Regions:
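Active-site anion-handling motifs in enzyme catalytic cores
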Residues: 1-373
Length: 373
């Protein structure tokens, strides 16, 4: 870090997402000075909030791992507001702020939150750098945030290329057992030695479905169709995050093994990277699978990310299927999966080589911490 003594990192996923309206009982609101005072008052009664108190740290810079937190939805995402408050606070303390590896996007399921954007403008303009992970976010930043030091680097997860492609191979479940599988004998029987296909959910399932049952029914139909059309392959569901919890019901209904949410991330990455095809509306799992050359069939998501990653990977056709596919769309997904599998190693090599390029590019992002505005 050169002259910097210490750097604070904010990690997203700490804060509950979803439809959130500010409450009089909560510390966060659109007035960040008031929010900071409220936070400090809340700490005695809620000690877990103490980590957010920047006064306790001896630091020179705050580095924000932006990822997918900054989707400008109405009502606002809570994690977006809290991370913005921390950036505001750090700048007020005279500290440097680096916003890295971020996405800036509209929410396809609500009105664009201009109030949040206006609140962020002075914060972003004071930051040392605003670095986004794909071209869609770069253009969005150009349109909405003036006077910022804007940079573009691929998602940091591409830097895992060497780890995903080392010599260790996962052939069965005993090497990747998470807590949920600790007493599950069937988990030991997971067979990754023969060709297999992976399926996960999408970040848009909650917004697109009327209820949990609708999502379960649609994905059960999809999974059964895939199993029927690809009898020569093992089929695995992948519970990527809490939003994919409904896949546990799909697993029971369709009698399909599921790779649980608590499975070690590197193990899941290797499993996805060696799948013949990955059907998903998830961004980071798609990157993990691509690192091994696995072609992805994308369903829509809660932002532009499932389109932007296809452009980043230089897909010949940019295509998103409905997050809750009907019978015709399921048939299209099956057709696309078969086409991609039949392209074999030529397609896999093309994807993998592109990921190697992106991994070499994203590693350069660390140099931003040594640069001056």
């Amino acid at each position: 870090m050169g002259a910097y003594k210490k750097v604070l990192y904010t990690v997203n996923r700490f804060f509950r997402r979803g439809h959130y309206y500010f409450s009089s009982a909560d510390f966060i609101n659109y007035d960040f000075d008031k929010s900071i005072k409220n936070l400090i008052k809340c700490i005695p009664a809620n000690p877990h909030l103490k980590d957010f108190d920047l006064r306790q740290y001896d630091f020179d810079a705050l580095v924000v791992n932006g990822e997918g937190s900054f989707i400008f939805a109405t009502p606002p995402w809570r994690e977006c507001m809290i991370e913005a408050m921390l950036m505001y606070w750090a700048e007020k303390m005279g500290k440097k702020v680096y916003f890295l590896n971020g996405m800036l996007s509209k929410d396809p399921y609500s009105d664009e939150n201009r109030k949040t954007i206006e609140l962020l403008k002075p914060i972003f303009s004071k930051a040392e750098v605003i670095s986004v992970r794909e071209q869609y976010s770069y253009k969005y930043a150009q349109q909405n945030f003036e006077n910022i030091n804007l940079k573009h680097y691929p998602d940091a997860l591409f830097s895992w290329y060497k780890m995903i492609n080392d010599d260790f191979r996962i052939t069965n479940g005993k090497y990747v057992m998470g807590i949920q599988g600790a007493t599950d004998e069937e988990f030991y029987e997971f067979d990754f030695s023969k060709p297999y296909i992976c399926i996960s959910g999408s970040s848009a399932v909650g917004n697109a479905s009327k209820n949990k049952k609708e999502a379960i029914d649609k994905y059960s139909e999809l999974v059964n169709k895939v199993k029927n059309e690809f009898k020569e392959y093992n089929i695995f569901l992948v519970e990527v995050c809490e939003g994919d919890a409904f896949l546990n019901d799909v697993s029971k209904i369709t009698n399909t093994p599921i790779i649980a949410i608590d499975t070690p991330i590197l193990a899941v990455g290797k499993i996805l990277a060696n799948s013949r095809v990955f059907i998903s509306g998830r961004y980071h799992p798609a990157i993990l699978s691509s690192l091994g050359g696995t072609p992805c069939i994308f369903m829509s998501s809660n932002s532009h990310k499932t389109r932007s990653v296809q452009e980043l990977l230089k897909y010949d056709e940019i295509k998103e299927y409905n997050v809750l596919p009907n019978a015709d769309e399921i048939n299209e997904i099956i057709k696309k999966a078969r086409e991609d599998i039949e392209k074999g190693e030529d397609l896999r090599k093309k994807i993998k080589e592109r990921c190697l390029e992106l991994s070499e590019e994203t590693i350069k992002q660390k140099e931003l911490l040594r640069s001056e505005k």
